[in-house]
Structure formats: structure tokens, C-alpha cells
Design a protein with these regions (language model features):
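Mature catalytic core of soluble alpha/beta enzymes
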Residues: 2-8, 17-316
Length: 316
């Protein structure tokens, strides 16, 4: 279950905002089944806020038309029903990135695992569990590449695309929140951007209400994504089934990793790796993170916590 990190807003930050002479602008709207929020330092930017707002909306609409599984007219949806398509830049980018992270994760990240999610159902609302035969058929469909599903990387990638545009018009300080987060530079108080990391316990259904800590950026370009199982699960005959499906086995994971917060140079990378970590479990996730340059993580398991050396967490 991919959960949205929230933009940590403290009274001191709001006061700092009021002292900047209006240099920071916030843009918000609806995209990809939720809301987005983009905060930028307008110093040195010649574009008007109205122009930036329109450009962000246009970019997100273009991404939706390309890779959304919920838009029946998107390139992705048309491809999944057998129609021949001409991939655009977004579609091609995600195919390339997805292949990269599938290989890096040993198959723990796989955008062709859509048949498995269809089989198990979002949130596991079915009264009966899939049979072994049904799982094998779904795995065969995954191997054949019948259905693509970019959900595990699309929001992170969207953050990167919006950030790319902001860089092009001279923005240096930004926070892009489209379900996942990309940030660079400083917040209005002159510090690194602060992102709350939720405590992964049953019953914590409101992001930001129960925090494990606050992650603070180092002032550079960083994507940050949390993936977790504690809000989405199904109990059948006394057994708890996690929302995360292992695309290699076709079944829900059974390890003790509750959440994985990953920081990477891009939000797309953080998005894909957070998903892979939740499939791999505590040890596999740690090994994956330690093998990659520029990647940090905060892993919370049922029996402990692991923090990579460069993960900047301020405990609550």
C-alpha cells in the first residue's frame, strides 16, 4: 500500500512564509486520484504564478492521458485491451525505468504484475482467497506481459516531470507533492524541507496524526517515498494478509516489514525502490539499499528499525 507522505507545516514555517515578502507560491489541484501541492520560491522566476499553475495542470493532464490505468482513453488503457499504440515520452520513460528497477530488485518490482492485483483485489474484499490454479494463471499472464500497471512508479515520476519544468523556468527551491514527494533547495524558513514519517501501527489512518519522526532534506534534489502495509490488509480465518503482492510468487508477502521510507535522487527511483523494499522484506530491502549509491532508507519492522547512514530523521 503506497501511502502519501504529508507536507509538514509548523507554525514557525508559516510565520517564516509571511516574512519572505510573498516570494513562495503554492499551487494545488487534483490529479491521479488525489490532490497535488507544489510550493516554489519565485525569486528570480520570470513566469507569472498563473502561467506556472496552467503549466503544471497541463503536464499532469498529459501524464494522465499517457500512463493512467483509470483513464479509459489513456495510452496505457488502450494498450492493455490490445490496441496498438505509439508510446509517447512518458510511456517510454516508464517502460525504461521499470525495466531498470525490475532488474535491480530481482523481480520484486514488476509493472507487469497487474493480473495479480486484479486477482487478489484492492484491499482483499473478496470472501474467498484465490486458488493455487488461479494464481498460476495470473503469473503466466504477468510473464506474457498482458497487462501493464504503472501505479508503483507513476506518482514519483510525475513529481520528477513537474520538477523538470520548474527547473526550466529558474526555480531553485521547490517541494512537489503528488502523492509522493520531490524536493530541492530550502523551505521558506531557510532550512531543508521537512517531511513527516508516520508511525506504522494499526489504526493510524490519518497521515500526520501519529508520527515516528521528521525527515529533513539536505538541501539537494531528493525524492522521498514511503510504502507500507499497515493500513491495507485482509484477515481471513485468523490470518493477516498484507496488501503488498510479491510478483515472483503471486502471493501476499508474509515478512515483518511494516513500512519503508526511501530517499533517492529522483522521486521515480524512490517510488520504485520503496515498493521493492516492501516486497523484499527487512533483510532484502537493506541489502538493496546498501547496494545503491545516493539511496537512503528508514525501514520499520515488527521487531525493530533499520536506518541507513545518510537518512536524516529527527525523532518525535
Amino acid at each position: 500500500m503506497k501511502r502519501k507522505l504529508f507536507f509538514f507545516t509548523a507554525l514557525t514555517l508559516m510565520l517564516a512564509c509571511s516574512c519572505t515578502g510573498g516570494r513562495y507560491e503554492t499551487f494545488s489541484g487534483y490529479a491521479q486520484g488525489g490532490t497535488y501541492r507544489v510550493k516554489v520560491n519565485m525569486q528570480g522566476v520570470k513566469c507569472s504564478p498563473e502561467t506556472i499553475a496552467a503549466a503544471i495542470d497541463s503536464l499532469l493532464e498529459g501524464i494522465d492521458f499517457s500512463i493512467s490505468g483509470y483513464n479509459r482513453n489513456s495510452l496505457l488503457s488502450r494498450r492493455n485491451v490490445g490496441e496498438e499504440i505509439v508510446p509517447d515520452r512518458y510511456f517510454s520513460d516508464l517502460l525504461e525505468l521499470s525495466a531498470k528497477y525490475k532488474e535491480l530488485s530481482g523481480g520484486a518490482f514488476d509493472v507487469y504484475s497487474g493480473p495479480l492485483f486484479d486477482l487478489w483485489g484492492f484491499g482483499f474484499t473478496s470472501d474467498s482467497l484465490p486458488s493455487d490454479e488461479a494464481i498460476e494463471r495470473a503469473l503466466a499472464d504477468c510473464k506474457a506481459g498482458k497487462v501493464l500497471n504503472f501505479n508503483a512508479i507513476a506518482q514519483g515520476y510525475s513529481c520528477d516531470i513537474v520538477a523538470e519544468y520548474l527547473y526550466s523556468i529558474g526555480v531553485k527551491d521547490m517541494l512537489v507533492d503528488i502523492g509522493e514527494i520531490f524536493c530541492d533547495g530550502r523551505n521558506p524558513s531557510g532550512k531543508g524541507w521537512s517531511i513527516g514519517v508516520d508511525n506504522p501501527v494499526d489504526g493510524n489512518d490519518s497521515p500526520g496524526s501519529d508520527l515516528r519522526g521528521i525527515w529533513r532534506s539536505n538541501g539537494g534534489a531528493q525524492g522521498v517515498v514511503t510504502s507500507g502495509n499497515y493500513r491495507k490488509f485482509y484477515i481471513k480465518d485468523g490470518k493477516k494478509y498484507a496488501h503488498t503482492i510479491d510478483p515472483r510468487s503471486g502471493r501476499p508477502v508474509e515478512h515483518g516489514l511494516l513500512s519503508a521510507t526511501v530517499v533517492a535522487p529522483t522521486a521515480a527511483e524512490a517510488d520504485a525502490l520503496a515498493t521493492a523494499c516492501m516486497v523484499l522484506g527487512p533483510q532484502g530491502a537493506r541489502e538493496l539499499v546498501e547496494s545503491l549509491d545516493g539511496v537512503e532508507a528508514y525501514l520499520i519492522s515488527s521487531d525493530g528499525v533499520w536506518t541507513s547512514g545518510g537518512f536524516n530523521l529527527e525523532q518525535q
